[in-house]
């Protein structure tokens, strides 16, 4: 079953390019079908990842944490006890195809 993860970030002033480069240069992660980085505002971004399954996503967590550690210095704390990321993930329950 297809799964997705979404992670919200806020980048420190002047660190946008380093943040984006870290994602452009990220190694291939098994089970990750597709990912996009979306600019949601001034220095704010979300990454959306499409996965083969929740099992593949869970197995990739060590790689995702290693990737995060490579650009953690570019991120601001989001506040409210979240730290530098606000992640959610889950299985697809409705799929729409308007192509």
Name these PLM-found stretches.
Residues 1-4, 8-10, 33-46, 70-99:
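Glycine-rich beta-strand-turn "strand-cap" elements at beta-sheet edges
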Residues 50:
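Sensory beta-strand/linker motifs that couple input domains to effectors
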């Amino acid at each position: 079953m297809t799964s997705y993860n979404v992670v919200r970030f806020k980048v420190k002033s002047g660190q946008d390019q380093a943040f984006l480069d870290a994602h452009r240069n990220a190694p291939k992660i098994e089970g990750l079908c597709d990912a996009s980085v979306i600019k949601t505002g001034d220095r704010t971004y979300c990454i959306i990842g499409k996965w083969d399954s929740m099992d593949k996503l869970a197995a990739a967590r060590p790689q995702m944490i290693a990737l995060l550690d490579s650009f953690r210095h570019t991120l601001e704390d989001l506040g409210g006890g979240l730290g530098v990321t606000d992640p959610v993930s889950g299985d697809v329950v409705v799929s729409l195809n308007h192509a």
